[in-house]
Amino acid sequence: MVTSCKLQPRPPSGTKEILVSNHADFDHDHLGHLLMDKRLAVPNFQRPYSWDHNNIEEFWEDLQRARESGSYFMGTIVLANDASNQSRQLVIDGQQRITTAAILFVAIRNRLNDLGKTQAASDVGSKHLADYILVEERSELKLSLGPDDEVAYRKLVEEEDDISIGAIYDSYVQLKEYVDRLAPSKDDYKNLIALTSFLDSGVQVLLAIAPGLSEAYVIFETLNDRGADLTTADLLKNYLFSSAGSDSIDYVQAVWTRVNSRFEKSDDFVKFLRHEYMSRHGRVTSRGLYKALQADIGRSPREVRRYLEGVEDALTRYLAFKEPDSSYWSSIPED
Protein backbone atom coordinates (compact mmCIF):
# COMPACT_ATOMS: atom_id res chain seq x y z
CA MET A 1 0.00 0.00 0.00
CA VAL A 2 1.09 3.55 -0.73
CA THR A 3 0.81 5.98 2.15
CA SER A 4 -0.18 9.25 0.50
CA CYS A 5 0.32 12.58 2.16
CA LYS A 6 0.70 16.26 1.49
CA LEU A 7 3.98 17.21 3.10
CA GLN A 8 4.18 20.58 4.76
CA PRO A 9 7.38 22.08 3.36
CA ARG A 10 9.51 24.56 5.22
CA PRO A 11 8.45 28.19 4.71
CA PRO A 12 9.29 28.99 1.09
CA SER A 13 12.30 31.19 0.60
CA GLY A 14 11.97 31.73 -3.13
CA THR A 15 10.05 31.06 -6.33
CA LYS A 16 11.20 27.44 -6.64
CA GLU A 17 10.08 26.53 -3.14
CA ILE A 18 6.69 28.18 -3.68
CA LEU A 19 6.17 26.20 -6.89
CA VAL A 20 7.13 22.98 -5.14
CA SER A 21 4.71 23.59 -2.28
CA ASN A 22 1.88 24.50 -4.66
CA HIS A 23 2.27 21.84 -7.35
CA ALA A 24 4.05 18.80 -5.90
CA ASP A 25 2.32 15.78 -4.45
CA PHE A 26 4.57 13.80 -2.13
CA ASP A 27 3.83 10.12 -1.49
CA HIS A 28 5.57 7.54 0.64
CA ASP A 29 6.05 4.32 -1.31
CA HIS A 30 8.37 1.32 -1.55
CA LEU A 31 10.77 0.59 -4.38
CA GLY A 32 9.32 -2.76 -5.41
CA HIS A 33 5.73 -1.57 -5.04
CA LEU A 34 6.54 1.39 -7.30
CA LEU A 35 7.24 -1.04 -10.16
CA MET A 36 4.10 -3.02 -9.32
CA ASP A 37 1.79 -0.03 -9.07
CA LYS A 38 2.88 2.29 -11.89
CA ARG A 39 3.97 2.34 -15.50
CA LEU A 40 7.22 4.28 -15.66
CA ALA A 41 9.30 5.59 -18.54
CA VAL A 42 12.76 7.13 -18.62
CA PRO A 43 12.62 10.07 -21.10
CA ASN A 44 14.93 9.96 -24.10
CA PHE A 45 16.80 13.06 -22.95
CA GLN A 46 17.96 11.40 -19.72
CA ARG A 47 21.45 9.97 -19.43
CA PRO A 48 21.81 6.23 -20.11
CA TYR A 49 21.98 3.75 -17.26
CA SER A 50 25.47 4.04 -15.80
CA TRP A 51 25.79 2.17 -12.51
CA ASP A 52 29.03 0.20 -12.39
CA HIS A 53 30.35 -2.73 -10.35
CA ASN A 54 30.98 -0.61 -7.25
CA ASN A 55 27.51 0.95 -7.36
CA ILE A 56 25.87 -2.47 -7.61
CA GLU A 57 28.03 -3.89 -4.85
CA GLU A 58 27.13 -1.01 -2.53
CA PHE A 59 23.43 -1.35 -3.41
CA TRP A 60 23.47 -5.08 -2.63
CA GLU A 61 25.40 -4.68 0.62
CA ASP A 62 23.04 -1.92 1.75
CA LEU A 63 20.08 -4.19 1.04
CA GLN A 64 21.54 -7.05 3.05
CA ARG A 65 22.32 -4.82 6.04
CA ALA A 66 18.90 -3.21 5.86
CA ARG A 67 17.10 -6.56 5.80
CA GLU A 68 18.44 -7.17 9.29
CA SER A 69 16.95 -3.91 10.56
CA GLY A 70 13.72 -4.27 8.59
CA SER A 71 13.70 -1.04 6.57
CA TYR A 72 15.84 1.00 4.20
CA PHE A 73 15.25 4.55 2.89
CA MET A 74 16.51 5.06 -0.67
CA GLY A 75 15.83 8.76 -1.03
CA THR A 76 13.51 10.75 -3.27
CA ILE A 77 12.11 9.70 -6.63
CA VAL A 78 10.86 12.54 -8.85
CA LEU A 79 8.16 11.66 -11.40
CA ALA A 80 6.25 13.77 -13.92
CA ASN A 81 2.92 13.01 -15.53
CA ASP A 82 3.34 12.30 -19.25
CA ALA A 83 1.15 14.60 -21.32
CA SER A 84 1.37 12.24 -24.31
CA ASN A 85 0.46 9.08 -22.38
CA GLN A 86 -1.75 9.42 -19.32
CA SER A 87 -1.19 5.79 -18.33
CA ARG A 88 2.46 6.32 -17.43
CA GLN A 89 4.76 8.69 -15.56
CA LEU A 90 8.22 9.92 -16.50
CA VAL A 91 11.23 9.31 -14.25
CA ILE A 92 13.06 12.59 -13.72
CA ASP A 93 15.19 11.57 -10.74
CA GLY A 94 15.79 8.02 -9.54
CA GLN A 95 16.43 6.34 -12.87
CA GLN A 96 19.51 4.46 -11.68
CA ARG A 97 17.83 3.12 -8.54
CA ILE A 98 14.59 2.12 -10.25
CA THR A 99 16.40 0.45 -13.15
CA THR A 100 18.69 -1.45 -10.79
CA ALA A 101 15.70 -2.68 -8.79
CA ALA A 102 14.04 -3.88 -11.99
CA ILE A 103 17.22 -5.71 -13.04
CA LEU A 104 17.34 -7.31 -9.60
CA PHE A 105 13.79 -8.58 -10.08
CA VAL A 106 14.90 -10.12 -13.39
CA ALA A 107 17.74 -11.89 -11.57
CA ILE A 108 15.36 -13.12 -8.84
CA ARG A 109 12.86 -14.39 -11.41
CA ASN A 110 15.54 -16.21 -13.35
CA ARG A 111 17.01 -17.82 -10.24
CA LEU A 112 13.56 -19.04 -9.20
CA ASN A 113 13.23 -20.61 -12.64
CA ASP A 114 16.67 -22.21 -12.22
CA LEU A 115 15.44 -23.79 -9.00
CA GLY A 116 12.24 -25.09 -10.60
CA LYS A 117 9.99 -22.60 -8.81
CA THR A 118 8.23 -21.57 -12.02
CA GLN A 119 5.03 -20.28 -10.43
CA ALA A 120 6.95 -18.01 -8.07
CA ALA A 121 9.11 -16.85 -10.98
CA SER A 122 6.05 -16.08 -13.07
CA ASP A 123 4.56 -14.14 -10.17
CA VAL A 124 7.67 -11.96 -9.84
CA GLY A 125 7.67 -11.30 -13.58
CA SER A 126 4.00 -10.40 -13.87
CA LYS A 127 4.01 -8.16 -10.80
CA HIS A 128 7.26 -6.26 -11.32
CA LEU A 129 8.44 -6.57 -14.92
CA ALA A 130 5.75 -6.83 -17.59
CA ASP A 131 2.03 -7.22 -18.23
CA TYR A 132 0.72 -9.45 -20.98
CA ILE A 133 -1.79 -7.67 -23.24
CA LEU A 134 -4.04 -10.53 -24.32
CA VAL A 135 -5.87 -8.68 -27.10
CA GLU A 136 -2.60 -7.60 -28.71
CA GLU A 137 -0.74 -10.81 -27.80
CA ARG A 138 2.32 -8.99 -26.52
CA SER A 139 3.95 -8.03 -23.26
CA GLU A 140 4.24 -4.43 -22.09
CA LEU A 141 7.11 -3.51 -19.82
CA LYS A 142 6.26 -1.81 -16.56
CA LEU A 143 9.48 0.20 -16.92
CA SER A 144 10.56 1.63 -20.28
CA LEU A 145 14.12 2.90 -20.61
CA GLY A 146 15.82 5.34 -22.96
CA PRO A 147 17.00 4.35 -26.45
CA ASP A 148 20.49 3.35 -25.31
CA ASP A 149 19.14 0.87 -22.75
CA GLU A 150 15.71 -0.28 -23.91
CA VAL A 151 16.80 -3.09 -26.22
CA ALA A 152 19.11 -4.75 -23.68
CA TYR A 153 16.58 -4.39 -20.87
CA ARG A 154 13.70 -5.75 -22.94
CA LYS A 155 15.80 -8.76 -23.96
CA LEU A 156 16.58 -9.41 -20.30
CA VAL A 157 12.92 -9.27 -19.31
CA GLU A 158 11.85 -11.42 -22.25
CA GLU A 159 14.69 -13.90 -21.61
CA GLU A 160 16.35 -13.57 -25.00
CA ASP A 161 19.90 -14.82 -25.42
CA ASP A 162 21.56 -12.28 -27.72
CA ILE A 163 21.96 -9.48 -25.20
CA SER A 164 24.60 -6.93 -26.15
CA ILE A 165 27.30 -6.16 -23.62
CA GLY A 166 26.73 -2.96 -21.69
CA ALA A 167 25.90 -1.51 -18.29
CA ILE A 168 22.44 -3.11 -18.17
CA TYR A 169 23.79 -6.59 -18.85
CA ASP A 170 26.83 -6.14 -16.60
CA SER A 171 24.59 -5.18 -13.69
CA TYR A 172 22.37 -8.17 -14.34
CA VAL A 173 25.33 -10.58 -14.33
CA GLN A 174 26.57 -9.16 -11.03
CA LEU A 175 23.14 -9.23 -9.39
CA LYS A 176 22.49 -12.75 -10.68
CA GLU A 177 25.70 -13.90 -9.00
CA TYR A 178 24.49 -12.37 -5.73
CA VAL A 179 21.04 -14.00 -5.85
CA ASP A 180 22.60 -17.33 -6.86
CA ARG A 181 24.67 -17.19 -3.68
CA LEU A 182 21.64 -16.13 -1.66
CA ALA A 183 19.75 -19.22 -2.84
CA PRO A 184 22.37 -21.84 -3.78
CA SER A 185 19.87 -24.73 -3.76
CA LYS A 186 16.17 -25.40 -4.13
CA ASP A 187 15.83 -25.55 -0.35
CA ASP A 188 16.90 -21.89 -0.16
CA TYR A 189 14.33 -20.44 -2.59
CA LYS A 190 12.46 -18.76 0.27
CA ASN A 191 15.44 -16.41 0.65
CA LEU A 192 14.47 -15.01 -2.75
CA ILE A 193 10.83 -14.68 -1.73
CA ALA A 194 11.94 -12.82 1.40
CA LEU A 195 14.13 -10.49 -0.66
CA THR A 196 11.23 -9.77 -3.01
CA SER A 197 8.97 -8.99 -0.07
CA PHE A 198 11.61 -6.67 1.40
CA LEU A 199 11.90 -4.76 -1.88
CA ASP A 200 8.11 -4.46 -1.99
CA SER A 201 7.53 -3.32 1.58
CA GLY A 202 10.87 -2.56 3.26
CA VAL A 203 12.80 -0.34 0.82
CA GLN A 204 11.21 3.06 1.27
CA VAL A 205 11.24 5.99 -1.15
CA LEU A 206 9.68 9.43 -1.09
CA LEU A 207 7.83 10.19 -4.33
CA ALA A 208 7.62 13.74 -5.62
CA ILE A 209 5.00 13.75 -8.36
CA ALA A 210 4.66 16.78 -10.65
CA PRO A 211 1.93 17.55 -13.21
CA GLY A 212 4.48 18.13 -15.97
CA LEU A 213 8.14 18.20 -16.94
CA SER A 214 8.90 21.83 -16.14
CA GLU A 215 7.39 21.49 -12.65
CA ALA A 216 9.28 18.24 -12.11
CA TYR A 217 12.59 19.92 -12.86
CA VAL A 218 11.81 22.73 -10.44
CA ILE A 219 11.30 20.04 -7.79
CA PHE A 220 14.48 18.25 -8.78
CA GLU A 221 16.54 21.43 -8.76
CA THR A 222 15.13 22.45 -5.37
CA LEU A 223 15.84 19.03 -3.85
CA ASN A 224 19.38 18.99 -5.23
CA ASP A 225 20.59 22.57 -4.79
CA ARG A 226 22.23 21.86 -1.44
CA GLY A 227 25.25 19.79 -2.33
CA ALA A 228 24.12 16.90 -4.52
CA ASP A 229 26.83 15.34 -6.67
CA LEU A 230 25.58 16.58 -10.04
CA THR A 231 27.62 17.42 -13.12
CA THR A 232 27.47 20.83 -14.75
CA ALA A 233 25.46 19.24 -17.58
CA ASP A 234 22.95 17.85 -15.08
CA LEU A 235 22.61 21.19 -13.32
CA LEU A 236 22.20 23.09 -16.58
CA LYS A 237 19.58 20.66 -17.87
CA ASN A 238 17.62 21.03 -14.64
CA TYR A 239 17.90 24.81 -14.85
CA LEU A 240 16.72 24.97 -18.46
CA PHE A 241 13.87 22.51 -18.04
CA SER A 242 12.63 24.15 -14.85
CA SER A 243 12.70 27.58 -16.53
CA ALA A 244 11.11 26.53 -19.82
CA GLY A 245 7.47 26.81 -18.87
CA SER A 246 4.72 24.66 -20.33
CA ASP A 247 4.78 26.35 -23.75
CA SER A 248 8.52 25.88 -24.33
CA ILE A 249 9.26 22.57 -22.60
CA ASP A 250 8.90 20.47 -25.78
CA TYR A 251 11.28 22.76 -27.66
CA VAL A 252 13.82 22.74 -24.83
CA GLN A 253 13.63 18.96 -24.56
CA ALA A 254 14.14 18.50 -28.32
CA VAL A 255 17.12 20.85 -28.58
CA TRP A 256 18.77 19.46 -25.45
CA THR A 257 18.46 15.92 -26.79
CA ARG A 258 19.89 16.88 -30.19
CA VAL A 259 22.87 18.74 -28.75
CA ASN A 260 23.66 16.29 -25.94
CA SER A 261 23.47 13.31 -28.30
CA ARG A 262 26.46 14.63 -30.26
CA PHE A 263 28.79 13.93 -27.34
CA GLU A 264 29.61 10.46 -26.07
CA LYS A 265 31.02 11.72 -22.77
CA SER A 266 29.46 14.21 -20.39
CA ASP A 267 32.86 15.86 -19.89
CA ASP A 268 33.09 16.61 -23.63
CA PHE A 269 29.62 18.14 -23.58
CA VAL A 270 30.56 20.37 -20.64
CA LYS A 271 33.78 21.35 -22.43
CA PHE A 272 31.70 22.50 -25.40
CA LEU A 273 29.35 24.49 -23.16
CA ARG A 274 32.34 26.17 -21.53
CA HIS A 275 33.96 27.03 -24.87
CA GLU A 276 30.65 28.40 -26.19
CA TYR A 277 30.32 30.62 -23.13
CA MET A 278 33.94 31.83 -23.35
CA SER A 279 33.51 32.69 -27.03
CA ARG A 280 31.01 35.33 -25.93
CA HIS A 281 32.15 36.41 -22.47
CA GLY A 282 35.78 35.46 -21.97
CA ARG A 283 37.42 33.00 -19.62
CA VAL A 284 35.49 31.07 -16.97
CA THR A 285 36.70 28.19 -14.83
CA SER A 286 35.03 24.79 -14.97
CA ARG A 287 34.01 25.24 -11.33
CA GLY A 288 32.39 28.59 -12.03
CA LEU A 289 30.69 27.64 -15.30
CA TYR A 290 27.25 26.77 -13.98
CA LYS A 291 26.79 29.99 -12.01
CA ALA A 292 28.08 31.96 -14.98
CA LEU A 293 25.57 30.25 -17.27
CA GLN A 294 22.72 30.96 -14.87
CA ALA A 295 23.56 34.67 -14.91
CA ASP A 296 24.00 34.63 -18.69
CA ILE A 297 20.79 32.81 -19.59
CA GLY A 298 18.18 34.35 -17.30
CA ARG A 299 15.02 32.67 -16.04
CA SER A 300 12.27 33.37 -18.58
CA PRO A 301 11.19 30.85 -21.24
CA ARG A 302 12.10 33.37 -23.94
CA GLU A 303 15.65 33.71 -22.58
CA VAL A 304 16.02 29.93 -22.37
CA ARG A 305 14.94 29.53 -26.00
CA ARG A 306 17.33 32.27 -27.13
CA TYR A 307 20.22 30.60 -25.30
CA LEU A 308 19.51 27.19 -26.81
CA GLU A 309 19.20 28.65 -30.30
CA GLY A 310 22.68 30.08 -29.88
CA VAL A 311 24.06 26.83 -28.48
CA GLU A 312 22.70 24.79 -31.37
CA ASP A 313 24.11 27.25 -33.88
CA ALA A 314 27.51 27.20 -32.14
CA LEU A 315 27.53 23.40 -32.09
CA THR A 316 27.66 23.23 -35.89
CA ARG A 317 30.83 25.32 -36.00
CA TYR A 318 32.35 23.63 -32.94
CA LEU A 319 32.05 20.16 -34.44
CA ALA A 320 33.28 21.40 -37.81
CA PHE A 321 36.57 22.46 -36.22
CA LYS A 322 36.98 18.86 -35.08
CA GLU A 323 35.99 17.41 -38.47
CA PRO A 324 37.97 18.87 -41.40
CA ASP A 325 35.72 17.05 -43.88
CA SER A 326 32.54 18.50 -42.41
CA SER A 327 30.00 19.75 -44.95
CA TYR A 328 30.01 23.02 -43.00
CA TRP A 329 33.22 24.10 -44.71
CA SER A 330 31.82 23.62 -48.21
CA SER A 331 29.06 26.08 -47.37
CA ILE A 332 31.57 28.89 -46.78
CA PRO A 333 32.47 30.80 -49.99
CA GLU A 334 36.16 31.05 -50.82
CA ASP A 335 37.74 34.49 -51.12
Please give the residue ranges for each predicted region.
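Short alpha-helix boundary/capping and kink motifs at helix termini
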Residues: 5, 11-92, 96, 102, ...
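Flexible loop/turn segments at secondary-structure boundaries
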Residues: 84-87, 98-99, 213-216, 227
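Short active-site loop/helix that positions an aromatic residue
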Residues: 98-114
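Short, solvent-exposed secondary-structure capping/transition elements
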Residues: 110-118, 231-232, 286
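Extended charged low-complexity segments that act as oligomerization/scaffolding linkers
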Residues: 122-156
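Polyanionic (Asp/Glu-rich) segments that form extended negatively charged tracts
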Residues: 144-335
